[in-house]
């Protein structure tokens, strides 16, 4: 049995052995940087890389695939789980995940495939509650997870989608940029060169006098 079948099969195993972790980290890692694919959520303007695992270093800049859940390749009897932070000062990530509604869509782009999911269930659960992220027989599911309420983080927000046919998304661009910088941070960076230029102009005029 291949590692794709062993990890995230009908017998979901949330705790992997060292051997399984090593194999897991090598799957869908074509470029060798740990990126499995990309997720896009058009309604909240999210476009982020999906990394292996949910180490803090990953969640500071992107979203992570929860090891032990189904791999982000789709298929019957699969349930992929993607986790992301919210409320970071330098990256929006899943900050606006609570704005999603049933009927919204999100896409995962893995290798040369696009997997499209339609939101059909939104729940708030205790952190230890795994009952909503298990495999449902015959279904192709993906759940997006983040902490809630905003700033308190005592519970988990689960936004689940079921696989649908791909839609025409030719006008939507997917990027590898994990960071959406806050305007408060960007403004001083943009303003500094302008202020410096104005200062130089004023100094030149002053000297001419």
Where are these regions (language model features)?
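Solvent-exposed, non-transmembrane regions of membrane-associated and secreted proteins
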Residues: 1-184
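C-terminal single-pass membrane-anchor helix
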Residues: 173-209
């Amino acid at each position: 049995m291949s590692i794709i079948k062993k990890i995230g099969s009908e017998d979901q195993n949330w705790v992997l052995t060292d051997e399984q972790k090593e194999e897991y980290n090598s799957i869908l890692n074509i470029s060798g940087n740990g990126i499995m694919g990309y997720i896009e959520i058009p309604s909240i303007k999210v476009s982020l890389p999906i990394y292996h695992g949910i180490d803090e270093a990953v969640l500071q800049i992107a979203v992570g695939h929860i090891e032990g859940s189904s791999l982000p390749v789709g298929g019957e009897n699969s349930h992929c789980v993607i986790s992301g932070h919210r409320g970071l000062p330098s990256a929006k990530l899943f900050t606006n995940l609570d704005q999603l509604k049933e009927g919204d869509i999100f896409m995962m782009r893995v290798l040369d495939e696009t997997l499209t999911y339609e939101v059909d269930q939104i729940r708030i659960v205790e952190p230890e509650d795994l009952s909503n992220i298990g495999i449902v027989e015959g279904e192709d599911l993906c759940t997006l997870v983040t902490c809630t309420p905003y700033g308190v983080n005592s519970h988990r927000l689960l936004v689940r989608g079921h696989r649908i046919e791909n839609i025409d998304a030719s006008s939507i661009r997917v990027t590898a940029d994990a960071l959406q910088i806050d305007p408060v941070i960007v403004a001083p960076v943009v303003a500094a060169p302008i202020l410096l230029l104005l200062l130089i102009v004023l100094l030149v005029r002053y000297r001419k006098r």
